[in-house]
Regions:
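A short, proline-enriched helix->beta-strand linker immediately N-terminal to the Walker B motif
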Residues: 153-157
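ABC-type ATPase nucleotide-binding domains, specifically the catalytic core motifs of the NBD
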Residues: 16-18, 93, 97-114, 124
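Helix-to-loop junction immediately C-terminal to a conserved catalytic motif
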Residues: 56
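The feature captures the beta-strand-to-loop junction immediately N-terminal to the Walker
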Residues: 41-43
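Conserved ABC ATPase signature
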Residues: 134-138, 142
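Conserved ABC transporter NBD signature motif
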Residues: 64-76
Length: 259
């Protein structure tokens, strides 16, 4: 059994609003093993992105504990990379400079070694010929690849991905899912991947955490049975559709958490 890298121990997260406190997450307990790819599925407002923010140290839990490497998360960490829904790139910098920007921001300079590593990562994400291009010359999918390369530059142990392909069209989204699979196989990371797309979760993940509507509770944790490497043929397997239908039933089922 893989050693737990990320642990949620009976976590509750509430937010104060003008109409009173709202509980986003309640009684969430699960862990993520080293180099495990975990996808989180759930309806809008169930706290999926809140889980990610807790691991990132951007917020602190109202109750319970979130741990990384057996230590409570009390703030942002250098060993965690984040890819958001939108790539948030800097249009006045070229592609390579966007990838190396975290180094410039943190240390005030970018070394030759870091620039070389940025070029290597651009090759990994399929953009080796675009390093000198401006951001506005790239498609949405290409911009998200730049964001992934940027997140990988610091060589994080843990990669948090908050619906990174949600703004893309269906074909580009599928292409990016396979691209992410290839990158993950080349450079394994512990991944927490937030998504609304059931096929995307089944294609990418080792396990899927299915959340209830708000307050978000863990309804079920599903082991994904398909061997790696996965391919287009995986999408056509009968078991794939069976699991997709099962997850839909869980997402729309009444009731609370499964014991």
């Amino acid at each position: 059994m893989r050693k737990a890298v990320v642990q949620f121990d009976d976590v509750r997260q509430a937010f104060d609003t003008k109409n009173g406190a709202i509980t986003a997450i309640d009684s969430a307990s699960f862990d993520i093993g080293r180099h495990e790819f975990i996808a989180v599925l759930g309806p809008s407002g169930c706290g999926k992105s809140t889980l990610l923010r807790l691991v990132a140290g951007l917020i602190q839990p109202t109750a319970g504990a979130v741990k990384v490497y057996d230590r409570r998360v009390d703030g942002p960490r250098d060993d965690i990379g984040i890819v958001f829904q939108k790539p948030t790139l800097l249009p006045w910098l070229d592609v390579t400079a966007n990838v190396t920007f975290p180094m410039l921001h943190k240390f005030g300079r970018v070394t030759v070694t870091e620039t070389d590593e940025a070029r290597r990562l651009l090759k990994v994400v399929g953009l080796s010929d675009f390093g000198s291009k401006s951001i506005d010359q790239l498609s949405g999918g290409m911009q998200q690849r730049v964001a992934i390369a940027r997140a990988l530059l610091l060589n994080p142990d843990i990669l948090l991905m908050d619906e990174p392909f949600s703004a893309l069209d269906a074909l580009t989204r599928e292409e990016m899912s396979f691209e992410l699979l290839r990158i993950w196989c080349t450079s394994p990371k512990t991944v927490l991947f937030i998504t609304h797309a059931i096929p995307e979760a089944l294609l990418l993940a080792d396990r899927i955490i299915v959340m209830t509507p708000r307050p978000g509770r863990v309804r079920e944790i599903i082991d994904v049975p398909f061997p790696r490497p996965r391919s287009l043929a995986t999408l056509s397997e009968p078991r794939f559709n069976e699991l997709a239908n099962h997850i839909r039933e869980q997402l729309f089922a009444p009731g609370l958490v499964h014991a």
